[in-house]
């Protein structure tokens, strides 16, 4: 009997010891971020070892990412208001991800009169390079022998040009018998095949990247009457659609919502067109995305796009997205301290991104937004080390590529490391720099 009791006590001691070890391993601060649904599968969670948070583990801090859309992510960070992540979320907003860049007005307001006056300057830097794909569900059969592959088990693809994109997304073209094949210069079909258009109803950086291109290439000739696209996080805004969206348009919230709507329309045999990041499409474009690799996951067929400037057809691969962003360089010197210089929102660089000279036409970067100063030194260190891994660790790059994205160009990686992950640039922009944060000035968030 005594022996049994002794064994029970030993087992309990081992259990308690194990619990203590687990708690010690996860003893770091809670780090909260959120926003872009585009990067959500890449950033992931502790429970997914094939994601960035899964790779990072919990020894320095426990990261949680909330996929709520770029607009909500921006608002959460700028106001340090975690309820933008969800009604029951409390605590500090340490970072946000947004496919749409912050405007000059947003940055100025934050740094001059907003939380930046106590939290310290915000940092906005490119996180990944992405294409925005155009899924085409129940589209006419692919007859081309030259367009690039975009979909598993399908050697070629439906091709669309700017006139097609402007027509479909404005409501001018509502049937596949109106959509002109760029290769043959004839309609894709003579049969009636009405098209549903699925768009994001929430504040979406994916929408912003699409509308940036549409605003650059759509004209009164290729767009529905009264529709004028603007670069916006809101697709169905009153400037673009003063009379509301057409009857064939279907609203969906978040990338998962768009994919869900497409799945329903696919099952119903209804033709549909939408826009999504690669990680919500198929395994040809995103071979490791948790969204598309599960057993029986729908593999969405994707269009290739015709670049009118170099007259080539491109699949929305990460290599073609990087080709599209071209030779844009990272800011240096005093310009490095301006968050709007890291992601162009105006000028020639912006125009080059909106309608690129080569590569996949609807491409850009998704950004991470964070504070230079954190009041909790351990939180600041965890954020710093997570970012350092993202930009320099090959395992993290593999996760990025596996989700259909590219890492930022090497010149940006070097500039980010020398300005924000160290002070080798001597610009004093690095996270929790002692001359700027804490005793140096800003208390931090």
Question: What are the roles of these predicted feature ranges?
Answer:
Residues 1-25:
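Gram-negative bacterial Sec-dependent N-terminal signal peptides
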């Amino acid at each position: 009997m005594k022996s049994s009791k002794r064994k029970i006590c030993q087992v309990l001691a081992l259990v308690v010891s194990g619990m203590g070890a687990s708690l010690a391993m996860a003893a770091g601060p809670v780090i909260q971020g959120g926003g872009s649904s585009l990067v959500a599968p890449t950033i992931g969670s502790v429970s997914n070892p094939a994601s960035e948070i899964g790779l990072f583990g919990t020894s320095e801090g426990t990261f949680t990412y909330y996929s709520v859309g770029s607009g909500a992510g921006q608002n959460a960070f700028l106001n340090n208001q975690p309820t933008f992540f969800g009604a029951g979320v409390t605590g500090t907003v340490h970072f946000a991800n947004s496919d749409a860049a912050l405007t000059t007005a947003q940055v100025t307001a934050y740094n001059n009169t907003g939380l930046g006056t106590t939290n310290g300057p915000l940092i906005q830097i490119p996180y990944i390079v992405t294409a925005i794909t155009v899924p085409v569900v129940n589209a006419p059969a692919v007859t081309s022998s030259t367009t690039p592959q975009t979909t598993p088990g399908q050697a070629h693809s439906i091709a669309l040009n700017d006139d097609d994109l402007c027509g479909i997304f404005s409501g001018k073209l509502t049937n596949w018998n109106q959509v002109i094949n760029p290769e043959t210069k004839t309609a894709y079909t003579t049969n009636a095949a009405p098209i549903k258009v699925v768009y994001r109803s929430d504040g979406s950086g994916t929408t912003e990247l699409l509308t940036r291109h549409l605003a650059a290439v759509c004209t009164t000739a290729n767009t529905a009457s009264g529709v004028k696209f603007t670069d916006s996080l809101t697709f169905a805004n009153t400037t673009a659609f003063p009379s509301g969206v057409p009857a064939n348009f279907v609203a969906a919230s978040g990338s998962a919502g768009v994919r869900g709507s497409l799945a329903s329309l696919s099952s119903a045999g209804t033709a549909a067109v939408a826009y999504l990041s690669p990680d919500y499409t198929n395994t040809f474009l995103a071979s490791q995305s948790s969204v598309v690799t599960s057993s029986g996951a729908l593999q969405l067929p994707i269009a290739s796009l015709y670049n009118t400037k170099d007259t080539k057809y491109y699949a929305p691969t990460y290599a073609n997205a990087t080709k599209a962003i071209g030779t844009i360089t990272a800011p240096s010197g005093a310009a490095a301290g301006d968050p709007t210089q890291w992601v162009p929102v105006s000028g020639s660089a912006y125009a080059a991104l909106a309608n690129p000279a080569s590569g996949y036409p609807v491409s850009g970067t998704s950004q991470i937004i964070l504070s230079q100063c954190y009041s909790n030194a351990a939180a600041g260190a965890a954020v710093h080390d997570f970012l350092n891994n993202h930009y320099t660790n090959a395992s993290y790059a593999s996760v990025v590529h596996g989700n259909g994205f590219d890492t930022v160009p090497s010149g940006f990686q070097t500039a980010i490391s020398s300005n924000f992950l160290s002070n080798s640039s001597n610009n004093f922009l690095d996270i929790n720099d002692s001359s700027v944060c804490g005793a140096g000035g800003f208390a931090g968030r």
